[in-house]
From Swiss-Prot:
Superkingdom of the organism of origin: Bacteria
Protein family (similarity comment): Belongs to the DNA mismatch repair MutL/HexB family.
Pfam families: DNA_mis_repair, HATPase_c_3, MutL_C
Keyword field: DNA damage, DNA repair
Organism the protein comes from: Phocaeicola vulgatus (strain ATCC 8482 / DSM 1447 / JCM 5826 / CCUG 4940 / NBRC 14291 / NCTC 11154) (Bacteroides vulgatus)
Disordered: annotated span: 399-422
Name the record gives this protein: DNA mismatch repair protein MutL
TM regions (residue ranges): none
HAMAP family given in the database record: DNA_mis_repair
Sequence ranges of Basic and acidic residues compositional bias: 399-414
């Protein structure tokens, strides 16, 4: 029997490894920029064309490489960062596995130009799909320049699953932000299709944060700095009043490396307990400095998950540091015993009333309220013996009235699509309003109760309104008939560049809803018009919320983005729990609900109505 196990060619092995390391153009930029920082670069330029699908170029002024190192750098597991296993626990560099360049070269066409200081000529190396196509001496500046073209050219399936240019650019900006926030001493530029997106000089950390997210964020931040024998924790946390449901900037860094850490995130949010509304988040930029021997970086392909040896102790230190910062800046509620602000109430002067005698009351000292015999005779009188005849008379009087309800009162079977689609909503298909009463009742400002043939229908008024508005906005987008209401004084909304890319992707759908936005440059937009019917809502918060929701959902397809926008706007414009409705308003809401195609559930799957049948109601009173 012949042997069937064989070694894979290096090119195939590199493509397999690239599947973990290089997932999208943003992954290429992350690896190349981190290599530049490890090489001691003080200035890094990133140039991107078509969101990295066509080309990516990273230029640095670092140490550069010799001819031999340039050739060896594209071999798997070739690295200058470590030499033995013990070095994994003393890492001070971003890279160490020796996989990044080999993985990039396996799925793209790469050109490297590099020169070390003191060398007259540098080296140019050309590689395509792991195959070296050329190497020669060239004149070039000190440092390295990597040009990556046609990413995934030899893996069509991977290239097909890349997202739109706007989404991929947003991913690039996210990775770029993570790198520049942890390296404020390095200057960076980022260009996309020839346009400059970022130009960040080397500055202090606070100025770097402002350079990335805008000057407005400076007013939201409180500085934090705690140094212990175990860990140093520094950075900034947001003021409680700046909390938001979506779009909070939340970053953890350890030893100059970005990481995700849900456990430490909980420590921060616990410190804000009772300071921010439930479900809202605050921004934070937290930097840990820990002995490399006490953390394990090598547990995730992208190195974004890090294990700490003293995780629980650091959790306590972090939580205490945040609480101390909030207390130091008076950002926590306190009990104020200061009497300076109390009103000046004059003391009562009784001298003018000294001659007044108090009234005297006489009473019988022999009176005993517990003596039954002393109680006055009861004035209770028995009801008339003819009370049955009295009620019988009222009954005859009521039956003699010729009462007929309004024939135009709401009937669910006329508005519901259940008749047109038998079996679509089995539990409400016979739930038309009986007795044609046209009368609805509101319970605790949240539920609408109405009588139906099968029993009692209970409707969540907010969810019903969301269902109605969602269908309305989806129809407006599909028909491109959104009605815009002009603003007398346009609002200005500011977005970081990573969110601008998402905004551009959904801009057309926003216009169909009725929003009118003008690009002012630098991530600023003027809101000149908003959809009619959303009076009282903050347009800035509304647009930011839609952008953040689109970012979370990924905006995979156009229809999904349209649904996200319609649902976000519907939730914002719907009536709130506790809002008192007139009977006419409740009737209109019920009519509108059963005029939509799917009245039973909200677009995100929450129950809108429930019916308690007549038998269950009768059982309650047996």
């Amino acid at each position: 029997m012949s042997d069937i196990i064989r070694l894979l060619p290096d090119s195939v092995a590199n493509q397999i490894a690239a599947g973990e390391v290089i997932q999208r153009p943003a992954s290429v930029i992350k690896e190349l920029v981190e290599n530049a920082i490890d090489a001691g670069a003080q200035h890094v330029d990133v140039l991107v064309v078509d969101a990295g699908k066509t080309s990516i170029q990273v230029i640095d002024d670092g140490k550069g490489m010799s001819e031999t190192d340039a050739r060896l750098s594209f071999e798997r597991h070739a690295t200058s960062k470590i030499r033995e296993a013990a070095d994994l626990f003393a890492l001070h560099t971003m890279g160490f596995r020796g996989e990044a360049l080999a993985s990039i070269a396996a799925v793209a066409q790469v050109e490297l130009r590099t020169r070390m200081e003191g060398e007259e000529l540098g080296t140019m190396l050309t590689i395509s799909g792991s195959k070296v196509e050329g190497q020669e001496a060239v004149s070039c500046p000190k440092g390295s320049s990597f040009s990556v073209k046609n990413l995934f050219f030899n893996v069509p399936a991977r290239r097909k699953f890349l997202k739109s240019n706007q989404t991929e650019l947003s991913n690039i900006l996210t990775e770029f932000e993570r790198i520049v926030l942890v390296n404020p001493e390095v200057s960076f530029t980022l260009h996309h299709n020839g346009a400059e997106l970022f130009n960040l000089p080397a500055l202090q950390l606070r100025q770097r944060i402002m350079g990335v997210f805008g000057k407005k964020i400076n007013q939201e931040l409180l500085s934090l700095d705690v140094d212990t024998t175990m860990v140093r924790v520094s950075g900034f946390v947001g003021k409680p009043e700046t909390a938001r449901k979506k779009g909070a900037r939340q970053y953890f860094f350890v030893n100059g490396r970005y990481m995700r850490h849900p456990y430490f995130h909980k420590a921060i949010m616990d410190a804000y307990e009772q300071l921010v509304p439930v479900g809202e988040q605050v921004s934070y930029f937290i930097y840990f400095e820990v002995d490399p021997a006490n953390i394990d970086v090598n547990i995730h392909p992208t190195k974004t998950e890090i294990k700490f040896e003293n995780e629980q102790a650091i959790w306590q230190i972090l939580a205490a540091a945040v609480k101390e910062t909030l207390g130091k800046f008076n950002a926590v509620p306190s009990i104020d015993f200061d009497t300076e602000g109390m009103p000046d109430i004059p003391a009562f002067d009784a001298s003018p009333y000294t001659g007044i005698q108090p009234p005297k009351t006489t009473y019988n000292p022999d009176y005993n309220p517990f003596n039954v015999s002393a109680a006055p005779p009861s004035s209770y009188s028995k009801p008339s013996k003819d009370w049955e005849q009295l009620y019988a008379g009222l009954e005859r009087h009521a039956s003699s009235q010729n009462f007929h309800p309004d024939e135009n009162d709401y009937r669910a079977e006329e508005a519901s699509p259940a008749e047109e689609n038998p079996g679509l909503y089995d539990h409400v298909e016979d739930s038309s309003v009986s007795e044609k009463s046209g009368q609805h009742y509101q319970f605790k400002g949240r539920f609408i109760l109405t009588s139906v043939k099968s029993g009692l229908m209970i409707i969540d008024q907010q969810r019903a309104h969301i269902r109605i508005l969602y269908d309305k906005y989806i129809d407006q987008i599909s028909r491109r008939q959104g009605v815009s209401q002009g603003m007398l004084f346009p609002d200005i909304v500011q977005f970081p560049l990573s969110e601008v890319a998402i905004l551009q992707e959904i801009m057309e759908d926003l216009s169909f809803l009725g929003f009118e936005l003008t690009d002012l440059g630098g991530g600023s937009y003027a809101i000149n018009g908003v959809p009619a019917g959303i009076e009282g809502l903050n347009p800035i918060d509304l647009i930011q919320n839609m952008v953040h929701t689109a970012m979370e959902k990924g905006g995979k397809v156009k229809e999904e983005v349209q649904s996200i926008l319609a649902l976000t706007l519907a939730k914002a414009a719907a009536i709130v729990p506790g809002q008192v409705l007139t009977n006419e308003e409740m009737t209109g809401l019920v009519d509108g609900l059963f005029a939509v195609a799917t009245p039973n559930y909200t677009p995100d799957g929450k129950t809108v109505l429930s019916v308690i049948n007549e038998d269950d109601l009768e059982k309650l009173f047996k």
